[in-house]
């Protein structure tokens, strides 16, 4: 079983395509980014996702993506939008893990050897998942650069993680077989000209599912 997250969704149509394709998680970005969405629009998408998932008798988790935001604002948005999980993609301290419980907390790491990252690598609470992304100076994700699969595979042997960084419908199967992650995360890899592509979303989910069988 592989968990598939489609991140950076900004429209209801793309969110519903992800649900229909079989995605397990949909990421809504609240951090400065070209994929940023305002909380009111996100709440509309979240409601549509829940209805579509219920119709299919499936559970689809809504994940809010934040970068160096404060806990109070994160919790406020999470409540407004009915989020299931929080992804921290900045330099947040490990104390956020306890502050944001019982939400699922996904912490992005990039093997940059920073002190806060070492703290998160030592954190082992049941509601925390690590997300391995590529180390791109000045970027907090969505850059389309492939992560370090060797280090990710080593970490995946010790704890469940999501693999991100440069994944596409063409390479996600290889990534799953090599790293054996708990889940995979894609954003730019299912876009055409900077916009989510319905066909690529479907192809990505299908390729991930086939590789995990």
Curated annotation (Swiss-Prot):
One GO MF term: phosphoribosylanthranilate isomerase activity
Cite the Pfam families for this sequence: PRAI (PF00697)
**What does the record give as EC number?**
5.3.1.24
Indicate whether Ligase appears among the record's keywords: no
Kindly indicate whether the keyword Amino-acid biosynthesis belongs to this entry: yes
What this protein is called in its record is N-(5'-phosphoribosyl)anthranilate isomerase
**Superkingdom of this protein's organism:** Bacteria
Among CDD domains, the record links this protein to:
PRAI
Alphabetized, the UniProt keywords read:
Amino-acid biosynthesis, Aromatic amino acid biosynthesis, Isomerase, Tryptophan biosynthesis
Cite the annotated pathway: Amino-acid biosynthesis; L-tryptophan biosynthesis; L-tryptophan from chorismate: step 3/5
Membership in a protein family: Belongs to the TrpF family.
Q: Which organism is it from?
A: Roseiflexus sp. (strain RS-1)
Gene Ontology terms: biological process:
L-tryptophan biosynthetic process
Catalytic activity reads: N-(5-phospho-beta-D-ribosyl)anthranilate = 1-(2-carboxyphenylamino)-1-deoxy-D-ribulose 5-phosphate
Q: Which HAMAP family match?
A: PRAI
């Amino acid at each position: 079983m592989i968990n598939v997250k489609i991140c950076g969704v900004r429209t209801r149509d793309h969110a519903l395509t992800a649900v229909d394709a079989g995605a397990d998680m949909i990421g809504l970005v609240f951090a400065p980014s070209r994929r940023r969405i305002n909380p009111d629009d996100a709440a509309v998408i979240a409601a549509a996702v829940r209805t579509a998932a219920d119709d299919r008798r499936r559970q689809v988790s809504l994940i809010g993506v934040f970068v160096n935001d404060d806990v109070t604002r994160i919790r406020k948005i999470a409540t407004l939008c009915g989020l299931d999980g929080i992804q921290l993609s900045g330099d947040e301290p490990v104390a956020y893990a306890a502050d944001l419980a019982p939400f699922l907390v996904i912490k992005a790491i990039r093997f940059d050897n920073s002190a806060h990252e070492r703290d998160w690598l030592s954190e082992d609470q049941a509601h925390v998942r690590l997300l391995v992304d590529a180390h791109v100076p000045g970027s907090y994700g969505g850059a389309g650069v492939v992560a370090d699969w060797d280090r990710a595979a080593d970490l995946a042997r010790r704890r469940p993680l999501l693999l991100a960084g440069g994944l596409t419908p063409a390479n996600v199967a290889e990534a799953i077989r090599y790293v054996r992650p708990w889940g995979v995360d894609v954003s730019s890899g299912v876009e055409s000209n900077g916009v989510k592509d319905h066909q690529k979303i479907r192809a990505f989910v299908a390729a991930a599912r086939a590789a995990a069988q």
